[in-house]
């Protein structure tokens, strides 16, 4: 678009590193290359959910997983790191459906994979859906992105949502033969928390970037470090919600 070309032409005189948020379907090789050349160093992608049918029906986002996976290979070509934003606890969702989000993230080479609790903001279609289904009272005011679910869903109660969030990064990165351990680590009891802490230490050792790799480098740094090691969020540590999350509730 004209505005995109005008931005790139203008910003090449500034060249301060910048970060942006978008959706996978908006990018291609040409526009990411141009943005990297004028200072883009990091991207956050709103994927939100990994089940195609659920994503289309509930979120009105009609894109195939295979297309998301292919588009998210593009940033690495230009030395750009990126994160993927996911949400769980949507109305009518189940824990089984949440694992489709885990499966999709396992196929994406992001350096961070975030997951947040769905927040039913007033004035959105999903808020009306929640009220129509009796999952929330009309007078209930939502607060922030990192709080427990405010929805009353018997098929996916708040404690199960917290279990998925707690171990999301572990499920994404560890091989599936470790999933039984991770499942036990979901539980907020003495044994579950002990296993979780052990897995967290192992995760940090295996999947955090090495000192000589700069995951925020951009094109110039990418030429110096051709195979940076990417990681995802430290499990169990909450990150502030992004504006990208807010757009699709």
Residue positions per predicted region:
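Conserved SAM/AdoMet-binding glycine-rich loop
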Residues: 1-83, 88
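Ser/Thr-centric signal marking residues that sit
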Residues: 22, 101, 124
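Catalytic cores of alpha/beta
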Residues: 30-35, 91-107
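Conserved, mostly hydrophobic/aromatic
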Residues: 35, 45, 105, 123, ...
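Flexible glycine/acidic-rich beta-alpha junction loops that bind and position SAM and/or redox cofactors
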Residues: 53-58, 88-96, 111-158, 183-190
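Short, hinge-like loop/turn segments at secondary-structure boundaries
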Residues: 61-63, 101-102, 131-134
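Radical SAM enzyme core and accessory elements
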Residues: 139, 143-249
């Amino acid at each position: 678009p004209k505005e995109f070309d005008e931005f790139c032409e203008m910003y090449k005189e500034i060249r301060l590193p910048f970060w942006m948020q978008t959706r996978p379907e908006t990018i291609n090789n040409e526009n990411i290359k141009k943005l990297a050349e004028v200072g883009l160093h990091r991207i956050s992608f709103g994927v939100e959910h990994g089940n195609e049918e659920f994503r289309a029906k509930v979120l009105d986002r009609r894109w195939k997983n295979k297309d998301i996976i292919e588009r998210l290979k593009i940033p690495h070509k230009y030395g750009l790191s990126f994160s993927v934003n996911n949400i769980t606890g949507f109305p009518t969702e189940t824990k089984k459906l949440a694992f489709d989000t885990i499966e999709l993230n396992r196929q994406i080479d992001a350096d961070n994979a975030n997951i947040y609790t769905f927040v039913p903001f007033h004035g959105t279609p999903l808020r009306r859906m929640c009220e129509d289904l009796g999952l929330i009272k009309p007078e209930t005011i939502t607060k922030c992105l990192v709080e427990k679910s405010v929805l009353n869903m018997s098929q996916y109660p708040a404690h199960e949502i917290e279990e998925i969030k707690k171990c999301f990064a572990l499920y994404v990165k560890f091989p599936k033969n470790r999933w039984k351990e991770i499942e036990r680590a979901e539980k907020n009891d003495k044994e579950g928390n002990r296993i979780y802490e052990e897995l967290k230490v192992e995760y940090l050792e295996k999947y955090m970037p090495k000192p000589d790799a700069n995951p925020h480098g951009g094109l110039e740094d990418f030429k110096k470090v051709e195979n940076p090691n990417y990681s995802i969020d430290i499990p169990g540590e909450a990150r502030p919600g992004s504006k990208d999350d807010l757009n699709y509730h």
